[in-house]
Amino acid sequence: HCVTRRQRQMCIRDSGNPHAGSMRGYQRLVESGKEEPMATHADHYHTNFAYGRAAYSKGAVYLNQIRYIIGEEAFRSGMLRYHEEWKLKHPTDLDFIRLMEKESGMILDWFHEYFVHTTKTIDYGIKSVDATEKETGSTKIELERIGLMPMPLDVWVEYTDGSIEEFYIPVRIMRGEKPTEHTEKRTVVADWPWVEPTYTLTLPASLETIRAISIDPSQRIADVNNTNNVRVLISEQ
């Protein structure tokens, strides 16, 4: 996703994702066509491959998706609280997700249902980028949800002057938003109704001033096809 010099600098700061290997394992599971819901009892998986990837690769990805949704601070404090409240006990998956909801102030059962009880995948893309009426000097970006699983989005816009602005799009069903994670300018826009396949993001900037647009440049979302997550409008010289 780090296609311009400025974005590469930002991504170097966010590099070293310890979940990259788990994400590759999950990707191979999806591409194999053998994936089964994580909630399947271990003895009832059709293949050992699907069981192993679900238990280890997708299990690690699950935690990283929670981290992405609620933010680093809430995730860390939630994990510590989970350990303190449930050590030497027998928690269920619902005990974990309820604790994370309390810690973050968000509704998370939708994520748990999609990621654990189904094999629906995450896949977002930039469908189109167009200038609006010249009088307004704004730009319209149409985003599309190709996969069946919804997620909140971090959309980065790099301008020709080298500055970067993040547009954060919550999912309506989560009833909340994560705090900012960096020092770049950040705008929280209207939430995305989870049943809608497309979303229009209007930028208060003319098309000529935009160099590139990226969905999830930190590459934390378990997007099964991120080739459509970047649109470069003006190439660097």
Predicted feature locations:
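Single conserved hydrophobic/aromatic residue that forms the stacking wall/gate
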Residues: 1-12
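Short acidic/polar inter-strand loop motif in beta-rich domains
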Residues: 217-227
